[in-house]
Amino acid sequence: MEPISINIEDKKCFFYQDENANKCIIQPVDEHELGMLDAEIKEIKRLTNDNSFLLVAVLIDDWNKELSPWKAPAVFGKEGFGCGAADTLCFIRDFLIPYIRSSYRNVSEYYLGGYSLAGLFSLWAGYQTDIFRGIAAVSPSVWFEGWDQYILANTIMAKKTYLSLGDKESKTKNKIMSTVGERIRMQYECLRNDHILEWNVGNHFAQPDIRTAKGFSWL
């Protein structure tokens, strides 16, 4: 499927559209993930037997800054995490969704999701606003410093939440990232909406497109 590329508020967005779309999936991606979206969309259609959705990929230029809810030290390499998630959510809520509403009048439901840090961002956004009916947090970076305290003190607003993790993701020498298994179970226990935790085979880098498709399909 050939996407339509549109710049909205200087943010590049890719629209994978169906003329009869009545629901919209919004997914923050990097350049590498753009190349996997065709396979992801194909898998969503296969799993759901449903073509009536619009997928909008939002290209993220600075992954560690634009998707992080607050500042945190680096866990690998030297690059730490910024606090740009609020700006990214503001763009989606105040500019992207109004554009979609005006251009695709049949769309009435919005879903947000992503992989890795984009999965954490999607979870965090679900705590900030009720505009998203469902959240797909696929192999989310729930090891993020302070996330455990945050979910204990807050309640998610989305009606449905999909969580998944690879069964080998916690098997790492990195002490912070090795907590991801414990943290994803904690996240699951803290949710009070319709939710599921699915375990995938493999490490963090195994089939992100297929895993993400499974998440959106469950929603």
Q: PLM ranges: what are they?
A:
Residues G113-A118, S122:
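Gly/Ala-rich beta-loop-alpha elbow adjacent to hydrolase catalytic centers
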Residues W124-Q128:
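Active-site signature of alpha/beta-hydrolase-fold catalytic machinery across serine-
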